Swiss-Prot record:
Annotated InterPro entries: Rbsml_bL25/Gln-tRNA_synth_N (IPR020056), Ribosomal_bL25/Gln-tRNA_synth (IPR011035), Ribosomal_bL25_b-dom (IPR020057), Ribosomal_bL25_C (IPR037121), Ribosomal_bL25_long (IPR001021), Ribosomal_L25_dom (IPR029751), Ribosomal_uL5_bac-type (IPR020930)
The keyword Oxidoreductase appears for this protein: no
One Pfam family of this chain: Ribosomal_L25p
Gene Ontology CC annotation, any one: cytosolic large ribosomal subunit
Its job: This is one of the proteins that binds to the 5S RNA in the ribosome where it forms part of the central protuberance.
Keyword terms, alphabetized: Ribonucleoprotein, Ribosomal protein, RNA-binding, rRNA-binding
Molecular-function GO term, any one: structural constituent of ribosome
Domain of life: Bacteria
Name of the protein: Large ribosomal subunit protein bL25
Family under the similarity heading: Belongs to the bacterial ribosomal protein bL25 family. CTC subfamily.
Annotated gene: rplY
Length: 185
């Protein structure tokens, strides 16, 4: 996803309030844990993108930020919403540097749910864990990990270890945890 961002001057409340009134989202770009730049993202463009995004996929979406004539690859590290309107009011981006490890949550997508043996026998498919915490290089980031549930029978489970994890991605969480189960109704 490409975003054109502008620089912003200060962190004063009055300036940030004015940015939001003019249809912008104040944001901070970090690199190596340190603040690199204060920026502004177009609220309409970002909200439109969010509405098309699958649930949980924002954490593994790589953004290309056009900032002061250069392209910066970044991940959204934090997002703040308005309490009542649920509009995005602030973003934190983390710059992706080639060769430097990045920690992120990658969503787990169940495939072949319609053909699942346990569901055909009247069971209910329940996804217990929706994402997995991993460490990888920026070039190895994938939008999601697939878990095939076709052969899953009644009262059976699949663990995180059953996910085919691509080379270059190292899970941080325990792979012994249950990811998906088919429960009797």
């Amino acid at each position: 996803m490409e975003l054109v961002v502008q620089s912003r001057e200060t962190d004063k409340k009055s300036v940030i309030k004015k940015i939001r009134q003019q249809g912008g989202i104040p944001a901070v770009l970090y690199s190596g844990g340190k603040s690199l730049a204060n920026i502004v993202v177009d609220a309409r463009v970002f909200s439109k993108f969010l509405s098309t995004l699958e649930s949980g996929a924002l954490a593994s979406t790589v953004f290309t930020l056009s900032y002061e004539g250069r392209e910066i690859k970044a991940l959204v590290k934090d997002i703040q919403y308005h309490v009542t309107t649920y509009d995005v009011i602030h973003l934190d981006f983390e710059e992706l540097v080639d060769g430097r490890d990045v920690r992120l949550n990658i969503p787990i997508r169940c495939i072949n749910t319609v053909d699942c043996v346990g569901v055909k026998l009247g069971g209910s498919l329940r996804q217990v864990i929706r994402c997995i915490r991993v460490v990888c290089k920026p070039k190895d980031i994938v939008p999601f990990l697939e878990l095939d549930v076709q052969s899953l029978g009644l009262s059976q489970t699949l663990k995180l270890s059953d996910i085919c994890i691509p080379e270059g991605i190292r899970p941080v969480t325990s792979l012994k945890e249950v990811a998906v189960t088919v429960a009797r109704r």
